Curated annotation (Swiss-Prot):
Belongs to the NleE/OspZ family. GO terms for molecular function: protein-cysteine methyltransferase activity; toxin activity. It holds the Pfam family NleE. It comes from Escherichia coli O127:H6 (strain E2348/69 / EPEC). It catalyses: L-cysteinyl-[protein] + S-adenosyl-L-methionine = S-methyl-L-cysteinyl-[protein] + S-adenosyl-L-homocysteine + H(+). Keywords: Host nucleus, Methyltransferase, S-adenosyl-L-methionine, Secreted, Toxin, Transferase, Virulence. Its main location: secreted. S-adenosyl-L-methionine binds at A92, S98, R107, Q111, Y204, E208. The keyword Methyltransferase applies. It is an enzyme of class 2 (transferase). Residues 49-52 are annotated as: Interaction with host proteins TAB2, TAB3 and ZRANB3. The gene is nleE. GO terms for biological process: methylation; symbiont-mediated suppression of host NF-kappaB cascade. This is Cysteine S-methyltransferase NleE. The lineage of its organism: Bacteria, Pseudomonadati, Pseudomonadota, Gammaproteobacteria, Enterobacterales. Cysteine methyltransferase effector that inhibits host cell NF-kappa-B activation by preventing nuclear translocation of host protein RELA/p65. Acts by mediating cysteine methylation of host proteins TAB2 and TAB3: methylation of a conserved cysteine residue of the RanBP2-type zinc finger (NZF) of TAB2 and TAB3 disrupts zinc-binding, thereby inactivating the ubiquitin chain-binding activity of TAB2 and TAB3, leading to NF-kappa-B inactivation. Also mediates cysteine methylation of host protein ZRANB3, inactivating its ability to bind ubiquitin chains.
């Protein structure tokens, strides 16, 4: 089961050159062994050092870039509306689109991935008011972290974030139960079970959810 770390409120920025401190600021329960490892290829875009524990932040690539991204996010930020309208799946088809639709008040929750915990967008997001993140490593992947971003000023925010994690775990369990099946068949069968509700908690348009379910059903019929 996934045990994500939750930021229940906006994280206060810290003035430091040490890479370890900024990660612990948004991910306080991360395992200490993480900092004994050498930075991976994606970390090296933002930090320099023999290990993550002694690494320092790169001024331009992390410090300045995070400041630029935070400034941009503040201009796009909006207070939570009284009600949310469905959005097109295309609006949230990129990492930026996913979090932008949340901070601009279009939907209460979104999800994206980062290839490094030093990603400037992730740190900038965590400092916005009423924007929270649940972070956990993607299984069977040495680099990716899944970020569930949600509005803390809407009751739907954390409710849907928690449900996303439940559905994510359900899909993983189904794929493990189908370990005798071909990988593509496992992926499609598990997707069929969670796809409709997943689309609903992401606030996608009903017609687009229906179209996606039809696509999944057609794909399954071709595989079986």
């Amino acid at each position: 089961m996934i045990n994500p770390v939750t930021n229940t409120q906006g994280v206060s920025p810290i003035n430091t050159k040490y890479a370890e401190h900024v990660v612990k600021n948004i991910y306080p329960k991360i395992k200490h062994d993480y900092f004994n490892e050498s930075p991976n290829i994606y970390d090296k875009k933002y930090i320099s050092g023999i290990t993550r524990g002694v690494a320092e932040l790169k001024q331009e690539e992390f410090v300045n870039e995070k400041a630029r991204r935070f400034s941009y996010m503040k201009t796009m930020y909006s207070v939570c509306p009284e009600a949310f309208e469905p959005i097109s799946r295309n609006e949230a088809s990129t990492p930026e689109g996913s979090w932008l639709t949340v901070i601009s008040g279009k939907r209460p929750m979104g999800q994206f991935s980062v290839d490094s915990l030093y990603n400037p967008d992730l740190h900038a997001l965590c400092e916005l008011p009423d924007i929270c993140c649940k972070i956990f490593p993607k299984e069977n992947n040495d680099f990716l972290y899944i970020v569930v971003v949600y509005r803390n000023d809407s009751p739907l925010g954390e409710q849907r974030a928690n449900r996303f994690i439940e559905l994510y775990n359900i899909k993983r369990d189904i794929m493990q139960e189908l370990n005798y099946e071909l990988p593509e068949l496992k992926a499609v069968k598990s997707e069929m079970i969670i796809a409709r509700e997943m689309g609903e908690i992401f606030s996608y348009m009903p017609g687009e959810i229906d179209s996606y379910m039809k696509y999944i059903n057609n794909k399954l019929s071709k595989i079986e």
